Amino acid sequence: MTAAVTAAAVKVEKLLHVRVPLRDGIHLDANVFHPVGGTRYPAILVRTPYGKGADFPPGYSSFIQHGYAVVLQDVRGRYGSEGLFDALNQEGPDGYDTLNWIAAQPWSDGKVGMIGGSYLGIAQWRVALLNNSHLKAIFPVVSGSDDYLDRFYSPGGAMKLGHRLLWLSQNLTPAGLPKPKFGSYIGHLPLRTSDTAATGRTLAIYQTILEHPTYDSFWKDLSVRENIDRVRVPVFAVGGWYDNYVESDLDAFAALHKPGKDDTKHRIMIGPWPHNMSSPFAGVGFGNDSGAPIRAYQIAWFDHWLKGAPEDAAHYTPWAWHSVRAEVDEAPMHIFVMGVNRWRDEREWPLARTHYTAFYLTSKGHANTGKGDGALVWNLGKKAKPDQFVYDPRD
């Protein structure tokens, strides 16, 4: 389907439900939007398991206004796309084939950038590892860089059962079946059938993660962080101090930015945000400057890497005491310091001038409940009572 609409002062050509062929014969469903005109445009690609939407999302208008095409695509096995959903393995090759398809379209100039958060950020990392020549830069947000530690297991091998089963239940319960309540499956035993309790069916992805409870070669091969040397495209990562994946985001940046590498093209920004990037968090505000113009950063980033925009490009918007343009071209780190509630530019992670402080766990013998008397203290006490509790995985 083809139609034209208007995004602000720019007319938009709409190509809805375009079938994108993959190497194995599967077709993915995509919506394409680009400025009306006879020229070719660089493209912004968004690949999502959550539904690309039925029409033109107003939130992408600024890309159209700045001369980009926007491609929104349902990943394999989700919504309008064919195939079986395989989150651990599909996004690299499917993204690679999609990039080739975009480059071959009459409205494309062959240059593509990718954006998106959480799973949509993982999809960017996956294809960035494959070094498709059409992918010029990525902008992953709250995505993390290691599936084992970010999404499935804690250090030491305890499964993040609630985190994972909730996501599976919310997203992979078949249409027509009611979504079970969290309490009905979080305590389900045996673990081998918890996927059925949560979604009404056996899931290959869940069975696979049960087979790999330790950080073995399976997880290392999947890990972005472990394979970061394969990433050649410029990366602008965004994380939140209250997000599950912030440590992993910082680890990926540190690996990209380590001495001896071509680290001048990578950036990271960490703000006082949880996974959904909202503020205030838990009722605590961090001042008027705690937000960030993410879309302005994205446009500046892609104007530079997809269009070769000069440093003095006039349309970059000043923000607080710095400019978006300067952030793209200069300091590799932009972090929000809570307490003083201001942004600060840095050039390495961990910070070389860090002074590490030890904290100690203590109690009066009753730190064994959610309302216990456990505390963090500055000094290690000479004597403390033990805390005891009975663990039963069935209760």
Residue spans of the language-model regions?
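Alpha/beta-hydrolase fold nucleophile elbow
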Residues: 106-119
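Short beta-strand/loop motif that positions the catalytic acidic residue
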Residues: 231, 237-239
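Cap/lid segment of the alpha/beta-hydrolase catalytic domain
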Residues: 35-104, 146, 151-154, 159, ...
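Active-site-adjacent alpha-helix of alpha/beta-hydrolase-fold enzymes
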Residues: 247-266
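N-terminal cap/lid segment of alpha/beta-hydrolase-fold proteins
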Residues: 3-38
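Accessory cap/linker subdomain of secreted extracellular hydrolases
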Residues: 65, 129-230, 312-313
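Short beta-strand immediately N-terminal to the catalytic nucleophile in serine-hydrolase-like folds
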Residues: 114-116, 141, 238
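C-terminal, loop-rich substrate-recognition/catalytic regions characterized by aromatic stacking residues
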Residues: 186-192, 283-395
